[in-house]
């Protein structure tokens, strides 16, 4: 299986490129893609850029140009639920948009028109990564991740998201868009995020301090998953 891997920022990608076997750089539409393998699994890595549009574009390129058979998103996120600490990993069982509102047409808040409210990760991938995580010294959680084109850094914003999604575990800026694009193209997907901050008023300071470590932890979980696919 050839897997496309998307990270939004260089800090979220660097640990993966350092652990890529037989890496090669390929330029497509002005962006750099890294091909190679992890164990016996063929992969294509890309730094998409931040936000929903850039990440969804990368899904399309990975599918069309590189013919990947699955998509995995890795990187950092802000923790929203009690009991989730900076450094913990959250695996998205499902994802939703926290900034979409077409309720005037009868859709649920967060539901894009003509789309489901939730985008569910591939069940086989979830089962496999749970097995991997049981063997790693890494605190992890499985649940809902919310996506929007905002960096969440305040209690009022947290409260707003939780009003609509009380079971949300973490928030970030790409996952649901990647999931929607992958689902539209018939590709199984998985989203792995390590917590860089708590999305509160100190989030920007915490993010700057912990983004590299969050990227590394998320990548470590992903690498263990890929090697187990051998």
Language-model features and meaning:
Residues 1-123, 127, 132:
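Metabolite-binding pocket within alpha/beta catalytic cores that recognizes anionic/polar moieties
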Residues 178-209:
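Zn-dependent metallopeptidase/amidohydrolase metal-coordination segment
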Residues 200-230:
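His/Asp/Glu-rich mid-to-C-terminal helical/loop segments that flank catalytic regions of hydrolases
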Residues 9, 78, 95, 147-150, ...:
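Glycine-rich beta-alpha junction loops
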Residues 105-170, 177, 181, 185:
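Active-site rim beta-loop-alpha module in soluble metabolic enzymes
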Residues 75, 173-185, 217-219, 226:
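Conserved catalytic block of serine-dependent lipid acyl chemistry
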Residues 2, 67, 85, 141, ...:
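Short loop/turn motifs at secondary-structure junctions
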Residues 44-48, 146, 192:
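Active-site-proximal beta-strand elements of phosphoester/diester hydrolases
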């Amino acid at each position: 299986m050839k897997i496309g891997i998307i990270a939004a920022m260089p800090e979220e990608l660097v640990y993966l490129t350092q652990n890529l076997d037989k890496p090669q750089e390929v330029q497509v539409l002005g962006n750099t893609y890294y091909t190679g393998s992890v164990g016996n699994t063929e992969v294509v890595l890309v730094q998409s850029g931040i936000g929903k549009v850039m990440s969804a574009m990368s899904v399309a390129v990975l599918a069309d140009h590189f013919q990947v058979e699955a998509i995995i998103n890795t990187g950092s996120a802000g923790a929203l639920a009690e009991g989730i600490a900076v450094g913990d990993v959250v695996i998205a069982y499902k994802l939703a948009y926290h900034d979409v509102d077409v309720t005037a047409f009868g859709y649920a808040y967060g539901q894009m028109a003509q789309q489901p409210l939730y985008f569910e990760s591939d069940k086989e991938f979830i089962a496999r990564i749970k097995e991997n995580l049981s063997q790693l010294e890494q605190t992890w959680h499985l649940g809902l991740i919310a996506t929007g084109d905002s960096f969440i850094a305040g209690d009022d914003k947290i409260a707003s998201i939780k009003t609509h999604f009380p079971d949300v575990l973490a928030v970030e800026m790409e996952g649901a868009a990647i999931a929607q694009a992958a689902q539209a193209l018939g590709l199984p997907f998985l989203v792995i995020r390590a917590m860089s901050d708590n999305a509160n008023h100190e989030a920007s300071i915490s993010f700057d301090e912990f983004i590299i470590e969050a990227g590394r932890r998320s990548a470590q979980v992903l690498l263990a998953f890929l090697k187990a696919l051998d």
